[in-house]
Amino acid sequence: MRKEIFTKEQLELLPLIQMFSGRFGLVGGTAIALHIGHRRSIDFDLFSLKGFNGSSLDKKIRRYAKIDEVIVNRRGEFTILIKGVKVTFFHYDYPIVFAERLDKIVKMPDLLTLAAMKLFALGRRAKWKDYVDVYFILKNHYTIADVVQKSKEIFGSECNEKLFRSQMAYFADVSYAEPVEYMKGFEVSDKAIEKELIKFSLS
């Protein structure tokens, strides 16, 4: 795993993340970056296949760390800011397997599962960093057919291949609010990414 993608603040939070490793697994862009090493991480997304109580998480966390801000506390999601790092706890309704581990700290899905989750979420939140992740996955690791097949296994009838492909090539509503910091050797222009994603969408 490519732990160099973490910021100093994230490394300091790993013992806290480990406290919840029995119920939650690490997903999203941070988990993808740990597999690939392409960009700096900025947050932690922790998913559970079972429900949880946000207020109980709040109390447990405050015994070990100062919470700067509670951003979301509703059924199925608890998002906070600690040391400037956004940490999200989320109840995930789909059957994913946490087959990998970051040392003995936290479990994670394999890269193909993470790719399927990322592509499935693409149309729900158009952030440039998500397109960057998809680009590196399809460029160096899996074909679009691989990812679509995995998506069908996880999301069943909700998997829409035609929609996936169109979303990959549509950039009009993309948010660039969260800048992408590439790790050394992975630098690439936005235009090059857009060009390749359009090609992938047609492949």
Describe each PLM feature range:
Residues M1-S203:
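Compositionally biased terminal segments of proteins
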